[in-house]
């Protein structure tokens, strides 16, 4: 039931939707549509019970299959009552943008959030770091130890983790 925000026919069909308009505004305002490392498409759902009215960011795996997704609040009324980010229910997190890592580069940049990774070539994101220092799911560990094994890794964490980064 997701609307592909890169598909002009779908955008035309939903042109009167205030939610689609709000999501498109966020994409333009944050320059997500012109980012160097953006995914092929972004989505929005108008009906999903959990992810309704949220920007949907797909996580493609090494085989170009959507294995996970994260959603972000868009509407002002939701900012104070709903979590800013939610992941796919009952699914193990994967690395965002691992499908876009290129062997033309020696280094891969690892961000906390996927939107940060939109703006740097050869970057991935872990989609959140826990307070207890357990940062990765088993699947993410697997991706780090196989697909990204031979890359130099540069970690770029959000500021709340600066003092704790050396402890992880």
Predicted segment positions?
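Acidic, metal-coordinating catalytic cores used for nucleic-acid/nucleotide bond scission
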Residues: 133-137, 157-167
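Phosphate-handling DNA/RNA-contact segment within nucleic-acid enzymes
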Residues: 26, 48-151
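Short beta-strand-alpha-helix junction that forms the catalytic/metal-binding core
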Residues: 154
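A sequence-composition feature that detects small, non-aromatic residues
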Residues: 22, 35, 41, 91, ...
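Intrinsically disordered, low-complexity Ser/Thr/Pro-rich tracts
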Residues: 144, 167-168
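Residue-level preference for nonpolar/small residues embedded in alpha-helices
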Residues: 18-19, 112, 164
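TOPRIM metal-binding catalytic domain and adjacent DNA-binding surface shared by DnaG-type primases
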Residues: 1-56, 60-63, 102-103
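Compositionally biased non-globular segments, especially hydrophobic aliphatic-rich helices
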Residues: 44, 123, 128-130, 162, ...
């Amino acid at each position: 039931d997701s609307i592909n925000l890169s598909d002009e026919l779908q955008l035309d069909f939903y042109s009167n939707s205030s939610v689609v308009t709000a999501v498109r505004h966020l994409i333009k305002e944050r320059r997500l549509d012109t980012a160097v490392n953006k995914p092929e498409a972004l989505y929005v759902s108008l009906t999903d019970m959990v992810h309704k009215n949220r920007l949907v960011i797909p996580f493609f795996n090494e085989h170009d299959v959507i294995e996970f997704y994260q959603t972000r609040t868009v509407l002002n009324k939701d900012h104070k009552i709903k979590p800013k980010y939610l992941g796919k229910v009952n699914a193990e997190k994967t690395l965002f943008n691992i499908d876009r890592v290129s062997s033309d580069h020696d280094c891969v940049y690892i961000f906390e959030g996927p939107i940060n990774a939109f703006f740097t070539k050869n970057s991935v994101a872990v989609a959140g770091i826990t307070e207890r220092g357990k940062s990765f799911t088993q699947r993410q560990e697997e991706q780090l130890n196989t697909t990204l094994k031979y890359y130099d890794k540069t970690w770029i964490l959000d500021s709340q983790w600066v003092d704790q980064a050396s402890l992880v």
